[in-house]
């Protein structure tokens, strides 16, 4: 088993993510974060308590130093599989696309999307206004939106799920 010295604390780390105490020559206990990642703490004499994500330590010592703003991705989606063969350094966008591809994350619809400009109720009212004949400029003024964004809603490029729900509920069978 290959192990490397960790500069942040008196430990060795293996390619599987096991942290070994240099003093006791035994594996150190780790804990699981609320987000499901394995973490280890160390109380530094001068810096105080420091916590480290195990997968980031494995990546740093067995792949290469992680550039600022980059993520360490678990290839199989298992946050506790910290083996170096299961890790890769990726951009935030690549990390999100990977999570969506393997089913760990889906695009958030409606107001739960962090980029949403409207609440579900506002979007519903806007769609009903568009159905009733309101133009993009009027709707933009009423809802404080750019007319181009209103156009995206009108043509179902935004809020499509809500459009579909409204159309299903208003059609006569």
Curated annotation (Swiss-Prot):
One of its GO terms (molecular function) is endonuclease activity. The keyword Hydrolase applies. It comes from Bacillus subtilis (strain 168). InterPro entries: His-Me_finger_sf, HNH_nuc. Its EC number is 3.1.-.-. It holds the Pfam family HNH_3. This is SPbeta prophage-derived putative HNH homing endonuclease YosQ. A possible homing endonuclease, it is entirely encoded within the YosP intron. It is an enzyme of class 3 (hydrolase). Keywords: Endonuclease, Hydrolase, Intron homing, Nuclease. It comes from the Bacteria. One of its GO terms (biological process) is intron homing.
């Amino acid at each position: 088993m290959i192990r490397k010295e960790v500069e942040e604390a008196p430990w060795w780390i293996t390619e599987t993510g096991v942290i070994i105490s240099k003093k006791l020559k035994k594996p150190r206990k780790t804990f699981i974060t609320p987000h499901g990642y394995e973490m280890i703490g160390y109380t530094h004499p001068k810096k105080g308590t420091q916590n480290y994500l195990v997968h980031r330590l494995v990546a740093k010592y067995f792949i290469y130093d992680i550039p600022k703003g980059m993520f360490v991705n678990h290839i199989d989606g298992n946050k506790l599989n910290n083996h170096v063969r299961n890790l890769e350094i990726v951009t935030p966008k690549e990390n999100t696309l990977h999570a969506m591809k393997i089913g760990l994350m889906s695009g958030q619809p409606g107001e739960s999307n962090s980029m949403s400009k409207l609440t579900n109720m506002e979007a519903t009212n806007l769609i009903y206004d568009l159905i009733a004949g309101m133009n993009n400029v009027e709707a933009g003024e009423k809802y404080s939106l750019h007319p181009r964004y209103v156009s995206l809603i009108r043509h179902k490029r935004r809020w499509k799920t809500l459009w579909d729900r409204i159309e299903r509920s208003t059609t006569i069978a």
